[in-house]
Swiss-Prot record:
Family membership: Belongs to the ATPase alpha/beta chains family.
Residues annotated as binding ATP: 169-176
Catalytic activity annotation: ATP + H2O + 4 H(+)(in) = ADP + phosphate + 5 H(+)(out)
Encoding gene per record: atpA
Highest taxon above the source species: Bacteria
UniProt organism field: Campylobacter lari (strain RM2100 / D67 / ATCC BAA-1060)
Site (Required for activity): 362
Transport keyword on record: yes
Name the record gives this protein: ATP synthase subunit alpha
InterPro entries: ATP_synth_asu-like_sf, ATP_synth_asu_C, ATP_synth_asu_C_sf, ATP_synth_F1_a_nt-bd_dom, ATP_synth_F1_asu, ATPase_a/bsu_AS, ATPase_F1/V1/A1_a/bsu_N, ATPase_F1/V1/A1_a/bsu_N_sf
Length: 501
């Protein structure tokens, strides 16, 4: 087959026009040293702080240190097979995690990858792990209640949607139980819960997931797990991944609750990374920016303004103290960032007062505005009464002859302490709480033996539900006690006592 000269030139021209000269330029570097989950890399001159990189073995890393001749990269994986001289390439993007309804009911790692063997997560959207917290104008003050189902908290240290309330105490004082109870209490309230486990034993996390499944709470819960055996980098990232997932629901006019269990281990993971990256240590060997580590995380919880959809993200960070020392570095930092704290005490826990909440040291700085009026009416003097009871109790140990008024106050105090006790995983509705606290503060329990108060309470709710259902209904709808309702409640309690004591 012969071509004419002009045909040949047109074919060559056509081929040149069709030629796809798509050249991809990659910026790569070489590992100088790798140890303890951190790689020092030479050659990534244009790398940016927080940028993602990819190692030869396919594992991802995150740039944290920018030095004169090298960059410090934390490895987001085991780092096996990485050695000196291995190549590293820039990905020119920041870390994103999957968000959305597809994650509900799943257990994921700090990168949003499933670890529950329930298949792939088909996420509709990915969001940056590091986001700037909302500004002042985008927020609204906390005014809606977030019921924990725990009498002592809802009555004395109420939590509102969009609040940050710290749960603080020594190990084995029931901190996680308070958080899990709060998650269980959100059933049927259209609140998405996120439980972030940082540096926990895998057996402990498995137990938490089992409890949540048992009470039907996994239907609206996401569990983010960075266990004790995971690299420090993943433990550092886990809370940020969790809050990013929570922000998705908040920004879509929904309500979310996030639990960080716990931020003490989070700070330890960050300290470990910082020391390996040779950043100068400060107080208790923590780096200088450990306050910013937690403030930028907790500031992302908020109640949005009506213009932005009025969604909310409530945070319950947990801090573990050593021998009740709340004046250590991390506890004081987080106390100053949050809107109040629930202080759990070993002595109370061991003496059978559970939840072991120290009412004197616990406070909610903004939750009062969110408390329903009925609870406020019945528990108005409760904090003062309990404080006076504690004072009298200390005095009564030394003085045997107390006057009648003091003796009565002491006896009522004992009964109120008993009323505020609650078994784990049994949250109470606000109307049930109002009824039993009303009974205690108005003296209906004064002639009930302290040991019988638990039985009295257990029998009271079904009795009112059967005989006076309108009491619960009115508290639910009106959210306040009027004269008529108080009279009905007094009548119901008198009738119940006559039949059951």
């Amino acid at each position: 087959m012969k071509f004419k000269a002009d045909e040949i030139s047109s074919i060559i021209k056509e081929r040149i026009e069709k030629f796809d000269f798509n050249l991809e330029i990659e910026e790569t570097g070489k590992i100088i040293s790798v140890a303890d989950g951190v790689a020092k890399v030479y050659g990534l001159k244009n790398a940016m702080a927080g940028e993602m990189v990819e190692f030869e073995n396919g594992e991802k890393g995150m740039v944290l240190n920018l030095e004169e001749s090298s960059v410090g990269i934390v490895i987001l994986g085991k780092g096996l097979g990485l050695k000196e001289g291995s190549s590293v390439k820039r990905l020119k993007k920041l870390l994103k995690v999957p968000v959305g309804d597809a994650l509900i009911g799943r257990v994921v790692n700090a990168l949003g990858e499933p670890i529950d063997a329930k298949g792939v997560i088909e996420a509709s959207e990915y969001r940056f792990v590091e986001e700037k917290a909302k500004g002042i104008m985008a927020r609204k003050s906390v005014h809606e209640p977030l019921h924990t189902g725990i009498k002592a908290i809802d009555a004395l240290v109420p939590i509102g949607r969009g609040q940050r309330e710290l749960i603080i105490g020594d190990r084995q004082t029931g901190k996680t139980t308070v958080a899990i109870d709060t998650i269980i209490s959100q059933k049927g309230k259209d609140v998405i819960c996120i439980y972030v486990a940082i540096g926990q034993k895998q057996s402990t996390v498995a137990q938490v997931v089992k409890k949540l499944e048992e009470y039907g709470a996994m239907d609206y819960t996401i569990v983010v797990n960075a266990g004790a055996s995971d690299p420090a980098a993943l433990q550092y990232l886990a809370p940020y991944a969790g809050v990013t997932m929570g922000e998705y629901f908040r920004d879509n006019s929904r309500h979310a609750l996030i639990v960080y269990d716990d931020l003490s281990k989070h700070a330890v993971a960050y300290r470990e990374m910082s020391l390996i990256l040779r950043r100068p240590p400060g107080r208790e060997a923590y780096p200088g920016d450990v306050f910013y580590l937690h403030s930028r995380l907790l500031e992302r919880a908020s109640k949005l303004s009506d213009e932005l959809g009025a969604g909310s993200l409530t945070a319950l960070p947990i801090i573990e103290t050593q021998a009740g020392d709340v004046s250590a570095y991390i506890p004081t930092n987080v106390i100053s960032i949050t809107d109040g704290q629930i202080f759990l005490e070993t002595d109370l826990f061991n003496s059978g007062i559970r939840p072991a909440i120290n009412v004197g040291l616990s406070v909610s700085r903004v939750g009062g505005a969110a408390q329903i009026k009925a609870t406020k009416q019945v528990s108005g003097t409760l904090r003062l009464d309990l404080a006076q009871y504690r004072e009298l109790q200390a005095f009564a140990q030394f003085a045997s002859d107390l006057d009648e008024a003091s003796r009565k106050q002491l006896e009522r105090g004992q009964r109120m302490v008993e009323v505020l006790k609650q078994p784990p995983y049994s949250p109470l509705s606000p109307e049930n709480q109002v009824v039993i606290i009303f009974a205690g503060t108005k003296g209906y329990l004064d002639d009930v033996a302290v040991s019988k108060i638990g039985e009295f309470e257990a029998a009271l709710y079904p009795f009112i539900e059967a005989k006076y259902p309108e009491i619960f209904e009115q508290i639910r709808t009106k959210k306040a006690l009027d004269k008529d309702l108080e009279e009905k409640l007094a009548k119901a309690l008198s009738e119940f006592k006559a039949n059951h004591i």
